[in-house]
Amino acid sequence: MAGLKNVLLVEDDPMIREMYRIILVDRQYKIEMAGNSEELFKKLETFHPDCILLDVMLPGMSGLEILKLLRTDPKYGCQKTKIVILSNLAQRSVTDSAIELGADGYVIKSDILPKDLPEIISSLED
């Protein structure tokens, strides 16, 4: 596997977070995890992901608010980081907002199997 190997997973549900972690580690990804915006921004101080998997519904700041900050504030160094929204929200307005804010993809959790995550990440490689 080349390319996007450092992944930051931002998911507030610990069971889902762990399930995704196991799958990605098994496929040789280096994973850091966060359950909310505070943990995410702390992780970004020392971890520089190639890809961020970002839930929309998070405690505190929403995934869309986080996405906007990551894309517009250079202090996070994520303007060119691949960011995929993983959410249970299928409303067109939410998906459109995510793409307008700079998401590289929007995946509805119920439409995929967790084992599909590595292929989703691989599809983002230039």
PLM feature spans:
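Acidic catalytic/metal-coordinating carboxylates
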Residues: 36, 62-68
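Acidic, metal-coordinating helix/loop segments flanking the phosphotransfer/catalytic sites
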Residues: 33-51
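Conserved acidic carboxylate
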Residues: 11
